[in-house]
Amino acid sequence: MPTDNLSSKDKMALKARAHQLHAVVLIGQHGLTPEVIAETNRNLDAHELIKVQVAGDDRAKRIAIAQELCAATHAELIQHIGKQLVLFRRKNTDE
């Protein structure tokens, strides 16, 4: 479910909400695995807005991981600061 319809005002509000959150998904030395994607999906289903911690010092690799993770989970990258990502995906209200 793409969330391209978020305005900059919405993104600012989500950033403010995310400020107090702790990372619930940790991506380690093995990078983006199917287990990490599944765990991210579970957390997005439960919380809508989550923080993800990405290990490693290579900035380009962290950006690539963020893009791949967003594509795999149909989430939107709200913020990327250092090794922290903030992802958002609206809850499915059809269920």
Regions found by a protein language model. Give the residues of each.
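Positively charged, polar, low-complexity stretches
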Residues: 2-95
